[in-house]
UniProtKB/Swiss-Prot annotation:
It comes from Psilotum nudum. Keywords: Chloroplast, Plastid, Ribonucleoprotein, Ribosomal protein. Part of the 50S ribosomal subunit. It comes from the Eukaryota. GO terms for molecular function: rRNA binding; structural constituent of ribosome; transferase activity. It is found in: Plastid, Chloroplast. InterPro entries: NA-bd_OB-fold, Rib_uL2_dom2, Ribosomal_uL2, Ribosomal_uL2_bac/org-type, Ribosomal_uL2_C, Ribosomal_uL2_dom3, Ribosomal_uL2_RNA-bd_dom, Translation_prot_SH3-like_sf. Belongs to the universal ribosomal protein uL2 family. Signal peptide: none annotated. Residues 36-56, 225-259 are annotated as: Disordered. HAMAP family: Ribosomal_uL2_B (MF_01320_B). Its main location: plastid. This is Large ribosomal subunit protein uL2c. GO terms for biological process: mitochondrial translation.
Amino acid sequence: MAIRSYRAYTPGTRHRSVSTFEEISKYKPKKRLTLNKHSKKGRNNRGIITSRHRGGGHKRIYREIDFRRNNNDAPGKIATIEYDPNRNSYICIVNYENGDKRYILHPKGLNVGDLIFSGTEAPISNGNTIPLTKIPVGTFIHNIELTPGKGGQLVRAAGTVAKIMAKEEKWATIRLPSGEFRLISKNCLATIGQVGNIDANKITLGKAGSKRWLGKRPIVRGVAMNSVDHPHGGGEGKTSIGRKKPLTPWGRTALGSKSRPMTKYSNIFILRRRKKR
């Protein structure tokens, strides 16, 4: 993916950069593969904010992505590469020989016209989806299942990639992009290669309005609030937080305290925790 940088014509274009979308095909999304999406704006079913700093933004049409890749009967041909407003990775339409059409995540290096395969008999090639038991150690993979048949849940963001480190008995050891080493059943499916749009994290929005287009609202510091709104709030003029350690808006310890349950069921599958930032 190529990135275009702006000159400082206005304060908003200073340091701003956008994707040139050179890989994108000039096609509208397939209507039968899309759904109308109602924005929740960070609210739950009672209208209470459960995820702050969300709301507004451009209207979006949701594209139904095939994370299962369970069409084992026929090879598929990449028909288009498209932009998806609901994720930072690109997506592509696959036309299968049996007449089926599906959206999948775009693997890096795949072009329009390339063939992809799924199933136990598929070759070890970029974009093919194969059970972990058939993939050699050292192979780079993405869109990894946690439960066989449930569909890919791990390593789906733009530019991410995992690596198979070892295989023994029923389990494969996978190194995730975070640095975590995790055991995953060898019956789970994974896609060969890296997710496309690898330069997505190098784009600079440049102005506040660009973030509002994405549906992200401003983040206000706790010390700038009133004491009724945040534990850090209140005081005369610029004051410190007035506490021994930083707190969340709900009074829990912030910045460094572990929030993961000590007895979570998946702890036994994690061989090495992710790296500290």
